[in-house]
């Protein structure tokens, strides 16, 4: 709690709020003129046309804080990768971009991230593995961004957690952007969605910090700061493979979508559950990590997996493995 209060009382974050709200108010007026609207379809969890792409403020505020408050020349490769992903993803929010082009942009961006952290010096097999993991994270975040508030709350929890480890002022810009976005998105009828640009940018920024922490500590356990999203994304893929579905196609098979759509639990409530679960896990993570006790963290993660599976099997039953008829 003290960390949260200290973070929110940090002077640069006030500047971030002003810029973020100004950008969002402007975007909400301009976006409809260019038809940057998310229109509901059979996969959607919303029923009203809504402005999308508002997550453009995430990479903008993050990059702005790096340039204004960071060291000269700092994070050049990271910002280049973030800019590339931001441009391609935002264009995808405006007009559909072919999957191959999006994947190509992701590969280049990950390559730039690797350059930032000198990953190219690693063994080839490890470079490939980590690259696949980061691209998987980027696409998982995109699929997980399907109901009001979920990206904003989960992103806020993750950004605060990362800031607890490393007081990087650029994260304050991201936190300010997330809070401003939540003002318009965390409601029954959202004023805007983050869009691909928001989800992809968050995943890329978080991947940088988690990989950085893993390198510095020589411990990959930091990836569990994304445990809740990781569990839902990975297990949903497994069930989709069992049902012989194309896992690259859009869908609404995630557990959060089931809760919001089939169980009719309010979007905001589901988003708070996901964010709170990750926040509580992170508290345990930090408590045991800084006591140099890794086993309890892994036990807690295993417990999350078991609870998640138990809930899905209990609530969804055989539909988890039955092929869906069209």
Please tell me what each predicted stretch does:
Residues 2-234:
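"…together with the soluble PPM/PP2C metallo-phosphatase catalytic core" -> "…together
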Residues 1-5, 9, 215-326:
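C-terminal membrane-associated helical module and adjoining short loops/tails
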């Amino acid at each position: 709690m003290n960390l949260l209060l200290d973070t929110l009382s940090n002077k640069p974050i006030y500047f971030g709020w002003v810029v973020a709200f100004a950008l969002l108010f402007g975007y909400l007026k301009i976006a409809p003129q260019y038809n940057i609207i998310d229109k509901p379809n059979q996969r959607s969890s919303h029923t009203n046309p809504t402005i999308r792409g508002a997550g453009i403020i995430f990479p903008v505020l993050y990059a702005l804080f790096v340039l204004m408050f960071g060291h000269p020349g700092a994070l050049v490769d990271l910002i280049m990768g973030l800019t590339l992903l931001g441009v391609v993803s935002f264009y995808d929010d405006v007009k559909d971009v072919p999957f191959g082009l999006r994947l190509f942009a992701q590969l280049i961006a990950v390559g730039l991230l690797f350059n930032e952290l000198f990953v190219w010096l690693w063994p080839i097999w490890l470079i490939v593995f980590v690259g696949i993991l980061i691209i998987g994270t980027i696409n998982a975040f995109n699929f997980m961004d399907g109901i009001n508030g979920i990206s904003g709350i989960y992103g806020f929890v993750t950004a605060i957690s990362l800031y607890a480890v490393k007081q990087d002022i650029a994260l304050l810009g991201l936190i300010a952007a997330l809070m401003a976005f939540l003002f318009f998105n965390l409601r029954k009828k959202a004023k805007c969605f983050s869009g691909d640009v928001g989800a992809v940018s968050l995943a890329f920024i978080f991947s940088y910090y988690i990989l950085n922490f893993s390198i510095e500590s020589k411990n990959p356990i930091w990836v569990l700061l994304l445990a809740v999203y990781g569990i839902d994304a990975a297990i949903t893929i497994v069930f989709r493979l069992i049902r012989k579905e194309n896992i690259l196609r859009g869908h609404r098979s995630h557990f959060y979508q089931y809760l919001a759509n089939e169980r009719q639990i309010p979007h905001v409530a589901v988003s708070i559950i996901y964010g709170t679960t990750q926040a509580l896990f992170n508290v345990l993570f930090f408590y045991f990590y800084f006591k140099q006790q890794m086993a309890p963290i892994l036990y807690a993660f295993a417990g999350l997996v078991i609870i998640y599976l138990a809930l899905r099997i209990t609530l969804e039953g055989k539909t988890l493995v039955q092929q869906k008829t069209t």
